[in-house]
Amino acid sequence: MPGVVAGIGTAVWTAYLALFPALAGWLATRWTARGSLARALAAAALWTLAEWTRSTGYTGFPWLVLGNSQLPVPAGWASPLAGYAPLGGVWLVTLALALCAGALALAVDAFAAPARGRAL
């Protein structure tokens, strides 16, 4: 029985923590137009806010933040975005990485836009 309870508890906790990025994505799509620069900026800002909110308060999970993936590792490798960490901490690195992802999404969307609606 304890294994079943632990499994249910883990599933509920995981679903709760997934609400933060889900809410950020829903708000970004609700407030902005598809393929716009405003959506990329809003999504990056809301994602950063969602991660900050998830890592403070009751939940307090400051690990698995997107910006942590860019910080130096013991082997000496570091992303160019790690240079923003002294200026604004992991949150600025998270925002910079989310902005890069938004720019990439806009580029892919602009490249694929002429092909939309055409039959193969």
Please identify what each model-predicted range represents.
Residues 1-120:
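Membrane-embedded alpha-helical bundles of multi-pass enzymes
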